[in-house]
């Protein structure tokens, strides 16, 4: 037998195994060092098998296993090892992206509070969809702008293709459910549509289409922006995709409009623990400079809950089934004497999710409906994306000589006794150029003043929506 060839194949496999754990592998055929690898049983099995074959060959005993069979076996094992390496890298990227999603959410909320008078205005955004749109656009921009985008969205440690890969399974956020399940509210209703409208006569660069088809499923639509019917066609698509929540985009089409990138996300889900309408009462909601009368829902139940000296936080779960991801609304309520900015600072610096514990809580939560339109141009500049709005040729890998003059999020959310319904249109116009024995008293959480809310996909931590309610 060609033992040197087998030795080379085994060392290749062991080197792959070492890579899985980030260790060094020192090649040694006759005296392999003990290796606490990804599959130590495989290593011992292989070395034992080879030792037995060598002993039989030395003793002149014929073996039924030939070199070709062994080589093919080791090739298969090496390919499986390659697959494990790929999966391991994907898992590392998934974990890193989960951290990036959380970091970007709070980075964005902090920037918005700095840029706007957020103690008066309500804030409603979709960090997850903004991040997706920015990643999509990073495929079309130059390298310098791409670096700015990836750093701003907290993904600078990943290369563009790896970031794209994180969105390749976006279709799986759509629940697998029967029509009856959806109609009865047993699972969330989720819709997502991304469209790129571009001026008739403009030619798309095929370079910009290669890497985005699977991750983003963009629908490219040719239109004459100068036509009187153009805005009507666009609004019709928005209204359909948002299930009627958003009817008219707050955007003006001009003679110089060359493209409109648009992403519409819709979410509707029922509470796992619904509020009884009979318990809803008219109560005060306090805001800076006054108070208003609101319909305050209430219930006492076991919730995931956390508090410290600065704020209370609660997780309200939505209905789901085994085929869907889990979704929750997190509410962060400043304690008396503390402000939204203090809470934002703390939840930015520490992970709240793992700190939740099951507690009995008497919760008072207002019904609310918020409708906002938020220009993010200045906010994104503050976050380091100045080049995006300065370039006269912003997306050369898709359309030449176009300038991005804003990125806007326009959305609506309704929260009531049954659950939550929300939609967000993100658009980018472009122009030319264990329980104790004694049951404790339920924790009181009275959401009767400013608070932060997030709708979170539990597994990845993706923030579908976030907001700050200052006044009702």
Language-model segments: residues:
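Gram-negative host-targeted secretion-system effectors, predominantly Type III and Type IV
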Residues: 4, 8, 29, 341-342
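Short, charged, amphipathic alpha-helical segments
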Residues: 40, 44, 63-71
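Residues marking helix boundaries in flexible regions
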Residues: 11, 18, 51, 77-79, ...
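Secretory/exported precursors with cleavable N-terminal leaders
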Residues: 33, 74-472
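Charged, low-complexity interaction regions
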Residues: 22-36, 55-67
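Short amphipathic alpha-helical heptad-repeat segments
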Residues: 3-10, 34-53
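Leucine-/aliphatic-rich long alpha-helical segments
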Residues: 13, 17, 46-58, 70
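Short terminal alpha-helical segments
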Residues: 2-24
């Amino acid at each position: 037998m060609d033992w040197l060839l087998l030795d080379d194949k085994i060392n290749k496999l062991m080197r792959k195994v070492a890579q899985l754990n980030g260790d060094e592998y020192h090649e040694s055929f006759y005296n392999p060092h003990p290796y606490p690898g990804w599959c130590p049983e495989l290593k011992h099995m292989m070395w034992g098998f080879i030792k037995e074959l060598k002993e039989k060959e030395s003793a002149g005993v014929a073996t039924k296993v030939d070199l070709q069979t062994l080589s093919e076996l080791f090739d298969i094992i090496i390919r499986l090892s390659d697959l494990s390496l790929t999966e391991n890298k994907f898992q590392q990227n998934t974990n890193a992206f989960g951290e990036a999603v959380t970091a970007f959410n709070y980075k964005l909320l902090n920037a918005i509070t700095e840029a706007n008078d957020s103690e008066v205005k309500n804030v409603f955004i979709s960090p997850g969809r903004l991040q997706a749109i920015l990643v999509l656009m990073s495929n079309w921009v130059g390298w310098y702008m791409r670096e700015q985008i990836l750093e701003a969205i907290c993904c600078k440690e990943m290369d563009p293709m790896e970031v794209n890969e994180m969105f390749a399974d976006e279709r799986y956020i759509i629940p697998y459910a029967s029509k009856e399940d959806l109609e009865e509210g047993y699972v969330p209703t989720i819709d997502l549509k991304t469209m790129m409208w571009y001026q008739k006569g403009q030619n798309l660069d095929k370079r910009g289409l290669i890497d985005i088809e699977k991750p983003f499923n963009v629908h490219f639509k040719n239109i004459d922006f100068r036509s009187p019917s153009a805005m009507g066609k666009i609004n019709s698509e928005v209204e359909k995709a948002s299930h009627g929540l958003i009817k008219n985009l707050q955007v003006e089409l001009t003679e110089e409009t060359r493209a409109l990138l648009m992403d519409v996300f819709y979410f509707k889900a029922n509470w796992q623990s619904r509020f009884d309408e009979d318990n809803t009462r008219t109560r005060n909601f306090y805001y800076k400079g006054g108070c208003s009368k609101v319909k305050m829902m209430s219930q006492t139940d076991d919730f995931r809950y956390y508090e410290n000296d600065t704020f209370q936080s609660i997780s309200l779960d939505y209905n789901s089934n085994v085929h869907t991801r889990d979704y929750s609304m997190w509410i962060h309520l400043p304690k008396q004497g503390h402000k939204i900015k203090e809470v934002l600072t703390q939840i930015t610096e520490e992970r709240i999710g793992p700190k939740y514990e099951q507690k009995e809580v008497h919760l008072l939560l207002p019904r609310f409906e918020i409708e906002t339109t938020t220009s993010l141009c200045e906010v994104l500049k503050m976050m380091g994306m100045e080049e995006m709005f300065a370039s006269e040729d912003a997306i050369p890998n898709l359309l030449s000589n176009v300038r991005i003059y804003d990125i806007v999020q326009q959305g609506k959310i309704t929260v009531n006794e049954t659950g939550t319904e929300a939609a967000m249109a993100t658009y980018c116009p472009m122009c030319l150029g264990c329980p104790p024995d004694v049951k404790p008293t339920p924790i009181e959480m009275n959401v009767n003043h400013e608070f932060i809310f997030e709708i979170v996909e539990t597994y990845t931590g993706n923030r579908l929506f976030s907001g700050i309610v200052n006044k009702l």
